């Protein structure tokens, strides 16, 4: 996917708005020039700094005893010397703040829409309930965003909301695309669903559907040695108790309608969402104002720089 692809731009920019200059929001190399600046020495230095045994995890799954596994690990890695690993500090993600950024692509007939905010970490005690709330909003299968945007209004072919939980925080991001002439309506309906999840208890059937999906999908994540190893590594990385692998489905079944509304009220900020629109600004600017999004920033696509504090290239770097 190219760095000028509207979907790539929308996905990269929403993470940047949500996380600021925290590494989770930092864009990767988004141009040929950026990739060309990475040298072999850079890769060697990175590997030497971070690829050390005291900064690594190992999971072995298969038909062998613990003693056999330890012996195999010792044989393969016994000579791997420990080294000090640097302590790294990060900028804190910015507090949720309403910000609407329009990346202008004149002539585009579709608009990529992203709506997002900061979220809880993977280790948060309400992780399962939050995950379920976002699945009801926009997860796999039947969900509210798809229902209102596609089934009811016919504004898009797809709509979803993703909960990305990391070690030091996470993000809620809703995404869809629509025709230029329906951009304002699609955005308004998307944001309204965030409010609705707070204000109205979910239907018990919605809850049961999300529970069935999550509980039913879990065995697929532990059905092969490779997938079991990945689950173990993930739990070790996040500092989670491995017993959670045995109790996960119970945790899912214990979530209630009240829990969904509670976490929605506690962790969603519908009036402070970051919003990204990538499309022809002239085609929908008036719609935004009519739908309650009077304040927005317009950035011509040729001027966009995700690494710049103001998201704009320096004057000498612009192509227009």
Language-model-detected regions and their locations in the chain:
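M16 family metallopeptidases and their MPP-like homologs
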Residues: 6-33, 55-61, 110-121, 146-257, ...
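Short, conserved secondary-structure transition motifs
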Residues: 1-2, 92-104, 212-221
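Hydrophobic side chains in well-ordered alpha-helices
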Residues: 69, 145, 186, 263, ...
């Amino acid at each position: 996917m190219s760095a000028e692809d509207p979907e790539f731009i929308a996905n990269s920019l929403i993470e940047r708005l949500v996380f600021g200059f925290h590494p989770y929001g930092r864009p990767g190399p988004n141009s040929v020039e950026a990739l060309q600046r990475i040298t072999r020495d850079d890769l060697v230095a990175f590997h030497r700094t971070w690829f050390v045994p005291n900064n690594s995890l190992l999971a072995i799954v298969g038909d062998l005893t613990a003693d056999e596994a330890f012996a195999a690990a010792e044989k393969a890695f016994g000579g791997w010397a420990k080294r000090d690993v640097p302590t790294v500090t990060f900028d804190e993600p910015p507090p949720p703040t309403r910000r609407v950024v329009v990346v202008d692509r004149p002539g585009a007939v579709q608009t990529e829409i992203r709506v997002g905010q900061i979220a809880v970490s993977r280790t948060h005690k309400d992780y399962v309930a939050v995950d379920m709330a976002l699945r009801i909003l926009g997860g796999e299968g039947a969900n509210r965003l798809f229902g209102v945007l596609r089934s009811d209004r016919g504004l898009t072919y797809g709509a979803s909301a993703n909960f990305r939980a990391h070690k030091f925080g996470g993000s809620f991001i809703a995404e869809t695309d629509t025709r230029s002439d329906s951009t304002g309506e699609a955005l308004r309906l998307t944001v309204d669903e965030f409010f609705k999840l707070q204000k109205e208890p979910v239907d018990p059937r919605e809850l049961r559907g999300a529970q069935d999906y999550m509980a039913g999908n879990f065995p697929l994540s532990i059905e092969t040695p490779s997938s079991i190893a990945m689950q173990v590594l993930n739990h070790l990385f996040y500092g989670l108790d491995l017993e959670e692998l045995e109790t996960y489905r119970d945790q899912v079944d214990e979530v209630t309608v009240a829990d969904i509304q509670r976490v929605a009220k506690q962790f969603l900020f519908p009036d402070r969402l970051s919003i990204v629109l990538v499309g022809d600004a002239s085609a929908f600017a008036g719609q935004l104002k009519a739908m309650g999004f009077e304040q927005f920033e317009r950035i011509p696509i040729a001027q966009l720089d995700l690494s710049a504090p103001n998201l704009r290239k320096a004057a000498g770097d612009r192509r227009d």
